[in-house]
Amino acid sequence: MSQLRLLPSRLGAQAARLLAAHDIPVFGWRSRSSRPPATLPSSKGGGGSSYMEEMYFAWLENPRSVHKSWDSFFRKASEEAFSGSAQPRPPSVVHESRSAVSSRTKTSKLVEDHLAVQSLIRAYQIRGHHVAQLDPLGILDADLDSFVPSDLITTIDKLAFYDLQEADLDKEFQLPTTTFIGGSENTLSLREIIRRLENTYCQHIGLEFMFINDVEQCQWIRQKFETPGVMQFSSEEKRTLLARLVRSMRFEDFLARKWSSEKRFGLEGCEVMIPALKTIIDKSSEMGIENVILGMPHRGRLNVLANVIRKDLEQIFCQFDPKLEAADEGSGDVKYHLGMYHERINRVTNRNITLSLVANPSHLEAVDPVVQGKTKAEQFYRGDAQGKKVMSILVHGDAAFAGQGVVYETFHLSDLPSYTTNGTVHVVVNNQIGFTTDPRMARSSPYPTDVARVVNAPIFHVNADDPEAVIYVCSVAAEWRNTFNKDVVVDLVCYRRRGHNEMDEPMFTQPLMYKQIHRQVPVLKKYADKLIAEGTVTLQEFEEEIAKYDRICEEAYGRSKDKKILHIKHWLDSPWPGFFNVDGEPKSMTCPATGIPEDMLTHIGSVASSVPLEDFKIHTGLSRILRGRADMIKNRTVDWALAEYMAFGSLLKEGIRVRLSGQDVERGTFSHRHHVLHDQEVDRRTCVPMNHLWPDQAPYTVCNSSLSEYGVLGFELGYAMASPNALVLWEAQFGDFHNTAQCIIDQFISTGQAKWVRHNGIVLLLPHGMEGMGPEHSSARPERFLQMSNDDSDAYPAFTKDFEVSQLYDCNWIVVNCSTPANYFHVLRRQILLPFRKPLIIFTPKSLLRHPEAKFSFDQMVSGTSFQRVIPEDGAAARAPEQVRRLIFCTGKVYYDLVKERSSQGLEEKVAITRLEQISPFPFDLIKQEAEKYPGAELAWCQEEHKNMGYYDYISPRFMTILRRARPIWYVGRDPAAAPATGNRNTHLVSLKKFLDTAFNLQAFEGKTF
């Protein structure tokens, strides 16, 4: 049988040769064709998959499942395959056709009719969604494609298109194995075939799945939707659905009555989303899911919090009270952005389930990769490699789903090994409008969901005014995700009963649509009338259900009036229980020394300079690098790459998970890291030495990302949310490219704690340095990060005992520019040893990675050593500070240029150079000490960046606060410019020489006023 599996590649040519000679047309193949086309053509009205292959595999499984003419043909073809005969024998039907012309004609007609029916079935499967009745308003087609399949409109059109006649409607036809409309029946009349196909594909559900290039997956979907009677619900299921609709609609009505002038972005017009989400959760819980992480925009968010996550109603209602003050630190956020974390019993499955709704900004779809990253992390911490315990649900708006590029970026993470969450259920609230924009002006694709086709995700469109259809589709979506570990999209085609918000007037821009909406009967009334008519519920029971929920809301409203303050921490989406306390008491504001024993440094270094696997051949160039590392270990020195290796390795020893992600991070953009070794003789055989340090170490993940900043940084941010006991780093290929992810930086990283009381310890590694490489490979834009830092330039702090750590606790993020590998080592370790978590922004070097002066001794990393916020002058100038004429402050790589120039001019005793390693929060205490140490010296700030960029605008007012404006801080650096760097090498060197000359010209500032 295995040999027969090779036949499909030859079937097209054989069919043409065997049958064309006898005037039996099959698939329109040309008799002169000597080989099959690149893709076997389908029958008329079909799609891209080979119909003949499907028939062939069906015959292999059961010869009686196909028509006898096909049985005969495949038998002859298989005999030829085994015998190797050059002249294939025709099928028996061909022998019979020779005996009589009438028999031949009859057989030809029989085959053609059966092929036509197969084609008709396939056409429905491929294109039935184009004519499905999806719009509750009946205004627009479900899609914006002007193409309407003429073969799927009327019975006459169908028959004519397939060369069938009305007399054929009552003929019985054998059903192919690619459909399940027959149920237990193998044959149906053409009339019944059409009726069942219409019911499956052209009513309130539109299915897009035939583009999926996996027969098993297509068959699974066909069976779920085509099998007769699959959408039958019990009375109890219908009553549950009605009760959920009542809660969804009455919640919105209650808010509208109590706070008619408040923005709440209600769900009216898509109330079915609440039972839809609950169905996905119920079904997933039934299949073993224990943790569901949701991301969604503002539309319907309060309803989801109340009726899906089950947030206490009084806490939601408190958010509408303008008189309540927040009890927590931070600025807070509007109510329809807040998140939530809740563990409860799922009433349907009677199992525990944890639900998280991730807080998000107004920037639509920005939360998508964050949710995926958090989901991936939760799966890791639960040992859930297959995604059977933790899953994500993403809710989208139609305009944003089609319009926001981060949706595409997130989809393309879905099947990458280090980023996959084993499938996400996407729910699109397709209200057919984007604020005021008509969908025909908002996208170029027929559907808002077409972006999902790039990852072969099935798309289930459904009319939101048919609650039972919605619930069934959502149940299937949950099953799909559990079965195939792939994404799936549910497109809820609905409408928006009010404007974009409750104060908005939609009639200005959509008059016809809103005239129809005003006439539209709410879905709750439609469904209640249906159930009452069929006797599932009585009118009295329905009214009692409404009264019951109204009473719940009123009671919660009364309790909300007793609240005196708001607690933002009650809306935390990612709590870290036990992290901020020790034995019930808050952790002290201290940080232990970050150095480690020398034997640990040596051990990590030896692993970093070797290959832990046998028979593993590495590149000769890499062998030189490893030998160089080994030499450094012998000499007790480290460069940048080794310092990073030692920081990571020591944390792994302490049980801290480390994850490094970004473009080309495995090797490193500048070929310095080499954390993944590649066997030069075995394809895709790799080794990560960092995972071979200790038997009981934590795992290390280093993964090259897709070529995305926005999506990947959002993912890593979400990953870091899940646990404080992990060092999660994202490295930009060049620091310049971080601005493609600016939304994540602005809306989540810099402001996340202030808005949502959510700590996060993510680390951003941003290669930065002016080296003549042009305006897009030079600057990580430090000025932008410093502008968003929240420390007060005019407030002179009190230097308490715990000032250093308290200052870190009060800031919104930490910004550093290390000039030594040792300090880089320490700041990475400090990030984990702090008693809290803050984002860490590190401007990392490029040329310093191999700079001979940027190698430092183990002595600066051993036990008892720590991160230096400021590195003072330690040369001749420091030994005679009273003779120093100028004190230059700087940060980062420019220090080495300054030291070289000072040496060349012999000014070591006249000019002191102090390095600012931690820029924000500003080290007021240490800078004050340095300035006072050199009372007779001019003070200057030197930077390689242009004056309107870099650090000067940040440090200058803080120096003035320290110095009480008694001494100026002069600027030394490049002039203001529009672009961050020149692309001309000569211009770069000229400007470098110019500001270095100024830095050491001791008369440069004479006669100038500050």
Swiss-Prot record:
InterPro entries: 2-oxogl_dehyd_N (IPR032106), 2oxoglutarate_DH_E1 (IPR011603), DH_E1 (IPR001017), KGD_C_sf (IPR042179), ODO-1/KGD_C (IPR031717), THDP-binding (IPR029061), Transketolase-like_Pyr-bd (IPR005475). It catalyses: N(6)-[(R)-lipoyl]-L-lysyl-[protein] + 2-oxoglutarate + H(+) = N(6)-[(R)-S(8)-succinyldihydrolipoyl]-L-lysyl-[protein] + CO2. It is found in: Mitochondrion matrix. One of its GO terms (cellular component) is oxoglutarate dehydrogenase complex. Ca(2+) binds at residues 130, 143, 145. Its EC number is 1.2.4.2. Thiamine diphosphate binds at residues 299, 398, 431, 433, 663. 2-oxoglutarate dehydrogenase (E1-like) component of the 2-oxoglutarate dehydrogenase multienzyme complex (OGDHC) which mediates the decarboxylation of alpha-ketoglutarate in the tricarboxylic acid cycle. The OGDHC complex catalyzes the overall conversion of 2-oxoglutarate to succinyl-CoA and CO(2) while reducing NAD(+) to NADH. The OGDHC complex is mainly active in the mitochondrion. Involved in the inhibition of cell proliferation and in apoptosis. This is 2-oxoglutarate dehydrogenase-like, mitochondrial. It comes from Pongo abelii (Sumatran orangutan). The gene is OGDHL.
